[in-house]
Structures are given as structure tokens and as C-alpha cells.
Amino acid sequence: MAERQEEQRGSPPLRAEGKADAEVKLILYHWTHSFSSQKVRLVIAEKALKCEEHDVSLPLSEHNEPWFMRLNSTGEVPVLIHGENIICEATQIIDYLEQTFLDERTPRLMPDKESMYYPRVQHYRELLDSLPMDAYTHGCILHPELTVDSMIPAYATTRIRSQIGNTESELKKLAEENPDLQEAYIAKQKRLKSKLLDHDNVKYLKKILDELEKVLDQVETELQRRNEETPEEGQQPWLCGESFTLADVSLAVTLHRLKFLGFARRNWGNGKRPNLETYYERVLKRKTFNKVLGHVNNILISAVLPTAFRVAKKRAPKVLGTTLVVGLLAGVGYFAFMLFRKRLGSMILAFRPRPNYF
């Protein structure tokens, strides 16, 4: 399996042979708080595809473990496996799903190229996906004064700086212990260090936040056009038309992350960009969105408790079964929570929301 994965990495995905695409199992490695993972999971839900999902816990540094680095040499989630195909980047995964599952029962999220809607959807998808969400994420942690009503615990701000050095030393140690992955670990260490220099620069952060406002102005205008061209008795439109598309996936997940970071009031609160505010409220009520991302902004539910269960499961002897696991949770829960607090900085550093990052 490892040899096959090494061969596939860096090459265009190959079609699985021997079975129809719909019959081959989809396997997704992701992390709940990874921005890129959230987009992929929402696409899977919108297309109603069956998929076996595996959490790669960033608080427990599972994305840095050798088995995962051999699966994806960048050590980033999400990663999709479909038969012989291994796809390691969110945009490529989404395009692969859209191009592979073409039966009539599977909803299409991208219009045909001949459609008048195609250029519009493609434009907004590319525009929204170009936003430096990783910089927003790191920046709001390092400089919380730029945010209002952030949903990230306050202690993360002080923890993150001490975790930066720990993450670098961890990658260095792993590089020494795994000679075959040394190049990959060193490359990841350099990428992390380089990005943090920019993301700790207040002037740079203010610049990209101003640029974000210009993008959201464009989205607000587009939503206003949809409202004006829709009859009163007509179906309420989405960003590019009547259908929920990949542009809506990008916009919905982007707004949800901005809310989490504490940038909602700045960008659509108090009557500012009312179309955007109405759109976000509508997205929150969408069944597929609520299923995938409904509780993701609640760190206790989406990260702390799952981490506690993961720690308890790893430490509980299997011979004693579930009863012991449940009993251990009372004591291990506190331990896991403290572990989570200690490593939350690393987790947030790994929220790579642009196509090449968490």
C-alpha cells in the first residue's frame, strides 16, 4: 500500500480499474477544523456520496506521523483515496468528485461549460478560494485585537507562540527518526516558519483584511443582482443562480470560518452587507451544511470531546471492552482537555485553508 501511494503522489489521478466508479469505496482523511477539509466534506454531502471518513487529529499531531506523511508528503489534510487514485489537495479532490460521479442520481455542483452560469460560478469559486484564510486564522490568534466576538478560546493567544518552537523541534526530530521522510519534514518546517513571519505582521494582516472587504463587496453586489432578477414568487436564489454550486460551497465555508475567527461583525454585522448576512443565515439552515458544519465552531463539541475519546480509546485495554472506556473518560476527559489546551496552538497553526494548506 505504501509503495503504491508513493508512486501515485505527484502524478495525475488514474482511473480505478475493474469496478465502476460508483462501486469503489471513497476514503477521506481529514480534520474537522481544517478549512480545506470542510469544503471537501460539504461537497461530499451535497453530492450525497457514500464516504468512509477518518479524522487525522491535529491536536495529537497525527498529520505529522510517518504513516500520514507517506500518504501525503506535505503532511496536509484532506486526502482522498478512491481505488488506485490518491488525491491530496482540496481543489483537486473537489474537481475529481465532480468529474467522476456523473450519474443522474448525483447532483452536479458545477454547470456545463456551455452554460451561461459556468463563467460566473468559476469566477466566484476562484475568487473566494484565493483568499488567504490561513493568514486570517493565524493572524487573529496572534493579534486578537483585530477581531470581535472570536469563538476561539482566549488562552490560545498565549499558547500559540510557545507552540511554534515546539512544532519546529517536533518536525526536526521526526526528520531524524525517519530518513526516508527527512526531506518532506524539513520542507514542512520551512513552510511553517516562512508563513508565520508574514502572519505575525500587523501591517500585512490589515492589508489583507482590507482586501477581503473588497471581495465581499463584490459578493454583496452579486447577491443583490440575484434578488433583483428573481420574481417575488420565485425561488430564492443562491450566489450564481437558482442552484447551489461550488461557488456557494466556497462562500458558505468562508463565511463560517470568518464567523469563527471573529470577523463577522466587521464584515456583515449591524446592517453592513445585508445580502451577505441573509445569505449566511440561510446557509446555516441548509440541511447538508448543518450536518457537516453545524457544530464545528463549537470547539468543545467538535474538538475537545473527540480528542478526549481518542485519548481514552488509545489508553484503554481492549480486553476490558467499552465499559472501561466509558469509565476512563471521566478521568481522561480532563487530561485530554488539558492536552488539547496545550496543543491548541499547533492545531490552529495547521488550519490550512488555502488549496495548498490545511
UniProtKB/Swiss-Prot annotation:
Q: Which consequence is recorded for altering residue 116 to H? A: Impairment in the ability to induce mitochondrial fragmentation
Instruction: Indicate the segments annotated as coiled coil, or none if absent.
Output: none
Crosslink position(s): Glycyl lysine isopeptide (Lys-Gly) (interchain with G-Cter in ubiquitin): 50, 172-173, 188, 190, 203, 206-207, 214
Q: Name one GO biological process term.
A: protein targeting to mitochondrion
Q: Give a short account of its post-translational modification.
A: Ubiquitinated by PRKN during mitophagy, leading to its degradation and enhancement of mitophagy. Deubiquitinated by USP30.
> What would changing residue 247 to V do, according to UniProt?
In CMT2K; uncertain significance
Please list the residue ranges annotated as the GST C-terminal domain: 153-309
Effect the entry attributes to changing residue 256 to R: In CMT2K; recessive form
Tissues where the protein occurs: Highly expressed in whole brain and spinal cord. Predominant expression in central tissues of the nervous system not only in neurons but also in Schwann cells.
Family per record: Belongs to the GST superfamily.
Instruction: Quote the disease note of the record.
Output: Charcot-Marie-Tooth disease, demyelinating, type 4A: A recessive demyelinating form of Charcot-Marie-Tooth disease, a disorder of the peripheral nervous system, characterized by progressive weakness and atrophy, initially of the peroneal muscles and later of the distal muscles of the arms. Charcot-Marie-Tooth disease is classified in two main groups on the basis of electrophysiologic properties and histopathology: primary peripheral demyelinating neuropathies (designated CMT1 when they are dominantly inherited) and primary peripheral axonal neuropathies (CMT2). Charcot-Marie-Tooth disease, axonal, with vocal cord paresis, autosomal recessive: A form of Charcot-Marie-Tooth disease characterized by the association of axonal neuropathy with vocal cord paresis. Charcot-Marie-Tooth disease is a disorder of the peripheral nervous system, characterized by progressive weakness and atrophy, initially of the peroneal muscles and later of the distal muscles of the arms.
Give the protein name, as stated in the record: Ganglioside-induced differentiation-associated protein 1
The species is Homo sapiens
The gene name on file is GDAP1
